Amino acid sequence: MNKLDFDISKLPEYREDNCLEVKKATNGLPNSIWETYSSFANSEGGLIVLGVEEDKKHQLHITGVNNPDELVRDFWNTINNQQKISLNILTDKMVSVHTVEDKQIIVIEVPRAEREMRPVYVGTDPIKGTYRRNHEGDFHCTREQVLAMFRDASPITIDSRVISTMDFSVFCLDTIKDYRMRFNAKHTNHVWSKLDDELFLRRIGAMGLSTEDNKIHPTIAGLLMFGYEYEIVREFPQYFLDYQERMDPSIRWTHRVTSSSGEWSGNLFDFYYRIINRLTTDLPVPFQLKNNIRVDDTKLHEAVREALLNALVHADYYGRQGTVIIKSLDTLSFANPGDMRVSLKTALEGGVSDPRNTTLMKMFGLIGVGERAGSGVPSIIASFLEAAHHSPTYKIHFSPERVLCTIDLNKETQDGVDKASDKLPIKEETSDKISDKLQKIIVYMQGNSGVVTQAEIAKMFGVSDRQARNYLSLLLNDGKICAVGANKNRTYTLNIK
């Protein structure tokens, strides 16, 4: 919440939440204000309102502050004292005095701190003085959370770091071979294709020169992309990749792939290609033709691939609980460890690219995965909105930090039909549009052994069952198709004369 979203005249109607904190502060600044300042700065930002009290029923009451000018002066003196607060991220306009119900209150707008400024903490010890905010209020960050903020504050993404304690032997040669085959298919006659494996890996950022011994060693990105799981966990003890299919509610999962199984390498590259086809199987496919050939790859497929890649390249692999992808009957979910490096609002709006692992993103891009401009959350949303009438949902969790993307496949989409579609009226269409659809039905049947069902036609055009029957009736009347069977089992075949 910011001042633009906040209507001071309606203050008593608000409730404290993850972005609004009220404090009585009648005669002075409460000590807890600095914990809230830290928590908002390290979370999504928020408003602190002084001169307001919350009762036991969580109702807000305006009590006002005495000597607001003195309180504002004390506030600025304290926030600019680095013995009290690590960093002042406010501007003059973010602190203001207002009169409500003939009483004066102070409104302090705390923005989300840029990752380079985090953590923002109280006192001089970041481990003891760093806070974050959730719906229950301010909470003290663990050592693990504070160290994660320091990692993200670095101007250089961590996956470019060279691991001088490892050598070429940590890599799975089969993974490298598979990657190079895909690279060569994408880049015909590329100069890198003639290099040996070690030089090739240096060119793509998987290996680099160590400043410690002046020798070539794997980078973090190279280890994650091509390494064996048992080597990866030496650097990332919490590393874990988990894909689950939950297609039967009576059992925990119907299919599972984990990086720790020992049945395959356990690295990111192999994980992506082990699960991507299973992940996109059964997604609704609309009827589309390109050069009279049916197109089976949709914007929904594109969004799912982007979501999987996003989870893998934005994960903090030092974080807990691993990267977990779940496919169920009606949803797909993608969860990865680590906070977002920009605010959720900024990520959703796009325009700012700040990946946690830029080298990993580059390596996937070199083989055509996630290479499009604007790749990321906005791209996922745009692709999904084009394929459906709703957006994926994104949530940020703390303790531990995780980002969760959920795609709901159960809502009505352009690629499918509503479950109550038989009750929908027949749409009025021009004769040209109807003729075009009838021709598409014939072309579809020619490529489908000459057979089609009413349900397929409804799904093909995203129309009601009644509308689909209407198209088929027109073709029947023209003698172009024949009906076989009755009611639910009825199919339609081409009338070959």
Q: Model regions: which residues?
A:
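Conserved N-terminal catalytic/coupling substructures associated with nucleotide/phosphate chemistry
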Residues: 1-301, 306-415, 463, 470
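Short alpha-helical segments that sit at the start of domains
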Residues: 414-442
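Short amphipathic alpha-helical interface segments
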Residues: 175, 434-451
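Short, cationic-aromatic polyanion-contact patches
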Residues: 431-438, 453, 486-497
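Short acidic, hydrophobic short linear motifs in intrinsically disordered regions
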Residues: 450-460
